[in-house]
Amino acid sequence: MPGLATPTSINQSSVWFIFDEDMRIVAMRRLRTSSPPQTTSRLTVLTLLGALTACSMLGASVTAVASPPTQGAQHAVVLDNSTNASSTRPSQTTGSNSSNGSSNGSGGSKGSSRSTGAKVPKGLESFYRQDLTWTDCPDGVTGTAFQCATVTVPLDYDHPQGKTITVALKKLPSTSSSPRGSVFLNPGGPGGSGISLINAQAGLYKSGGLSGVLANYDVIGFDPRGIGQSTPITCWSPDDVQAIVAGRAEAPSQLTPGSATDIVAKGSREAAACQKYTEVPEILDHMDTRSVARDMDVMRALVKDQDLNFFGYSYGTYLGAVYTELFPDNVGRVVLDSAMDPALSRQEAFEGDAAAWEQTLRTYIESQQGKAGFPLSGTTDEAVSRLATFLDGLDAHPLTVSDGGKPLDRTKASMAIRTLVVASPDNWPLLTEGLAQAMNAHDGTTLMRNAESLSGGGGSPGTEEQTVELLQSVYAFSANRCLDFPDTGNQASWDAALASYRRDYPVF
């Protein structure tokens, strides 16, 4: 595909190619990153992974994938700024006669003769040239052959001679004796565990829809700094965890109802707890996306890959975009599912979410109007207004929940509605059932139970390990968002924005 390229900056427009199921180009268009791409479906993920092989055959590298709905089963693929990977970078070679890995499993994949050849950033030589030793994981999943390793990285890349932290990796080795490289995974969040993701997806890679990837690549999940088995943040005491497990306290949420003053005060208390309980409290100032991307480049070098191959979901697409901006010469095949627009501010991104959810809600209402049991009558506008008014009253009079469940206030009820409305039209009857009981009997039991059946949530997170993982994801989300998007504006502008959101997106 000579002559087709995207600008080197992620903040400019990109050339998007629309492929059909057979990876044939059926259209192309230029997209400005100020227009938020829509999300992909889970089915699309499996199809898009074929692009790793298909685009390799074409001599091109995939650097972003979204899936704006088009006619038929089509997908949008962005080519990176090299029009032909094999002609612009030294090629990777494989063979059984040479190996960069030692007998103890350090370095690259067994049987690989990959060589990084990439430039090592000044001052980071010791990190890029450390030994990487893979060992059998102590918590291996039955039927897999996971290997684990730990990488040391600077706490602060601007001062690499200072404190260091560790990043944990978990690898599902390729079924090939001469793999072409590695594919790194990020589940999103921010705050998601890549190690948990690879545990959950092992079956797909071993014998399911992703087996073609494992036939060519090692697949590696890693816990970003501050998460899981990497140097973690800890913003809670052991007693806090026990209280949540026992049901005496409620796990925190990324959405906190209350006034701005209440939220700021809560944040101050939580920040103090993070400083108190975190082993390396300075990590809270270095959980930004750019630092995670720089960690990824260290990992890329240590597995002996010249280019980074990466698969990111949701926030992971933003991480992938930041990596391509920081290391444009080290970009391999990067698949981004449910893409975030990297040019948007935090406020613009959240507003885009609300707009999408609200539009999906309107589509749901239109599909249910006139059906037996649907509790929202009138036009679509009237139905939305009635639902918003109903939700607004729940803070003063929450929905009851049977069997000892906690009452549903506005925040919890709207989150349950959102879960059911955005999941799939196939689940919309579950939402209608829950709304009917909530609005006719002021009982939120069915609404909550139906939402939990899709999200996997409900009540206590379960074990201590699950509780800690939840706590880390919530606090890591806050730390990362605050570092990536510092607050701008003032109380007056925030009040004006809130009034605008309530007018334009009355439900969500």
Where are these regions (language model features)?
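N-terminal export and membrane-targeting signals
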Residues: D22-A51, N309
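Active-site loop->helix "elbow" adjoining a glycine-rich segment at hydrolase catalytic centers
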Residues: S314-L319, F327
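Alpha/beta-hydrolase fold nucleophile elbow
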Residues: D305-S314
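A catalytic-pocket lid/entrance helix-loop region that shapes and gates access to the active site
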Residues: G208, T234-R248, T324-R386, E433-H442
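Alpha/beta-hydrolase fold active-site neighborhood
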Residues: S385-F508
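Catalytic-loop region of hydrolases
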Residues: R29-R32, L43-T47, G59-T261, V384-L387
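Conserved acidic catalytic loop of the alpha/beta-hydrolase fold
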Residues: A293-Q306
